[in-house]
């Protein structure tokens, strides 16, 4: 049985114009991770990632590094109980 993990992530920094949301969505889909991602009105990125632990943390790694052009200042990662998300979406 796979070890399912769910994390709630907030990314801050100079992220505008970097396609951060789409990069997270693409990486999550590639890794088979479910959940969602969105840009908040204050410029931060918020995401919920759920799936096998290793795959979830690969997406968290992208959040820490950011896509080209992003200057990530901070990443907050909080674990949550899995909720059996079925898809990944951009909100």
List each language-model region with its residue ranges.
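Intrinsically disordered, low-complexity, mixed-charge
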Residues: 1-91
């Amino acid at each position: 049985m796979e070890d399912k993990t769910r994390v709630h992530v907030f990314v801050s920094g100079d992220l505008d114009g970097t396609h951060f949301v789409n990069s997270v969505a693409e990486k999550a889909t590639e890794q088979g991770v479910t959940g969602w991602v969105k840009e908040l009105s204050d410029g931060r990125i918020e995401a919920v990632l759920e799936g096998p632990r290793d795959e979830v943390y690969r997406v968290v790694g992208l959040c820490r590094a950011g896509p080209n052009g992003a200057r990530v200042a901070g990443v907050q990662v909080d674990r949550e109980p899995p909720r059996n998300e079925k898809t990944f979406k951009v909100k």
